[in-house]
Amino acid sequence: MKFTELTVKEFENFVQNPSLESHYFQVKENIAIRESDGFQVVLLGVKDDDNRVIAASLFSKIPTMGSYVYYSNRGPVMDYSDLGLVDFYLKELDKYLHQHQCLYVKLDPYWLYQVYDKDINPLTEKNDALVNLFKSHGYDHHGFTTQYDSSSQVRWMGVLDLEGKTPASLRKEFDSQRKRNINKAINYGVKVRFLSKDEFDLFLDLYRETEARTGFASKTDDYFYNFIEHYGDKVLVPLAYIDLNEYIQHLQESLNDKENRRDDMMAKENKTDKQLKKIAELDKQIDHDKKELLQASELRQTDGEILNLASGVYFANAYEVNYFSGGSSEKYNQYMGPYAMHWHMINYCFDNGYDRYNFYGLSGDFTENSEDYGVYRFKRGFNVRIEELIGDFYKPINKVKYWLFNTLDRIRNKLKK
């Protein structure tokens, strides 16, 4: 085996293998994004004796104190079950970094530490062997965190395993609320379409509304546009919406049908108890439809014919479709826009051969007092599998300068208080 810099083509060909479980940050499109942020990029990998790439990683070189912080965001990409390969990569990476002005290196591999069911019952053993291997190479583990951290990627995820399933069989695994709300969205006639680059402000409007409502930390407009600009068809932006003209027409047709059936039954003499109960039930349905019709007509008059309900940003790579971020309208929540969007994207996975639908981030704190308990409950209702990643690893390369860097950082933090 040999450790070497890779070409973009070598890197891209390697990470296209879905068995490597790579992340959307470890794709060639991210090179341009990192460079637009002002960072140099280097692709570092391992080739076997037949010159085939067996490990690869996109590193950002972040200028710091006359040196560089080397950061592999969700890398390196390799088969981490091959501990011999991991050992070789880390050993050779250390040699490379000592020769290339590295202050310290940060790795946060997209690899599992443990898997749980939706109720946090363990399904696999802990991957301590991998964590200990990193530590044996002098890496500090950031810990098994159970909260969001702005300096780290999420360490917990909710994932749907689609392999061997169909939309119908998968839906049977959802809880009653998920099934009911998906059905509501379908009955309302909610539609989903993908936004073009020129329409991305429709996503941002819903995202900013959700940000203001929930208080969650958010990304800048430029952050999103950077992905839209560079990721091409690897970024998907669905919009769930309702066309009130179509919905009102459907309601009116349904109302007319029920009124006609009620009138036909009322015209009959000597009605049975069963018929009287049916008439009473139709009267309830007619009253409900009239209220819905009035509300929809008023909304059309005040808010327009098209109501934008929910939107999201997704990344698709060789491994999975990943829900990155989203927003929804609280005013129109009765139409179940988020459910329509997720159900549409789950079906997109089936239609395009993906075996994983990743709802993505969770804090790892699954108690009722956690900051994202509502998010967990939402994802839990889809019968997700909870995946815990192994976390962040740091290693100082220039130890003297690294000590000085940390000392100055502590002083700056004290002065801010």
From Swiss-Prot:
InterPro entries: Acyl_CoA_acyltransferase, FEMABX, PG_Glycine_Bridge_Synth. GO terms for biological process: cell wall organization; peptidoglycan biosynthetic process; regulation of cell shape. The gene is femB. The keyword Acyltransferase applies. It catalyses: MurNAc-L-Ala-D-isoglutaminyl-L-Lys-(N(6)-tri-Gly)-D-Ala-D-Ala-diphospho-di-trans,octa-cis-undecaprenyl-GlcNAc + 2 glycyl-tRNA(Gly) = MurNAc-L-Ala-D-isoglutaminyl-L-Lys-(N(6)-penta-Gly)-D-Ala-D-Ala-diphospho-di-trans,octa-cis-undecaprenyl-GlcNAc + 2 tRNA(Gly) + 2 H(+). GO terms for cellular component: cytoplasm. GO terms for molecular function: aminoacyltransferase activity. It comes from the Bacteria. PROSITE patterns: FEMABX. Coiled coil: none annotated. Catalyzes the incorporation of amino acid(s) into the interchain peptide bridge of peptidoglycan, using aminoacyl-tRNA as amino acid donor. This is Aminoacyltransferase FemB. Its EC number is 2.3.2.18. Its main location: cytoplasm. Keywords: Acyltransferase, Cell shape, Cell wall biogenesis/degradation, Cytoplasm, Peptidoglycan synthesis, Transferase. Signal peptide: none annotated. Belongs to the FemABX family. It is found in: Cytoplasm. It comes from Staphylococcus epidermidis (strain ATCC 12228 / FDA PCI 1200).
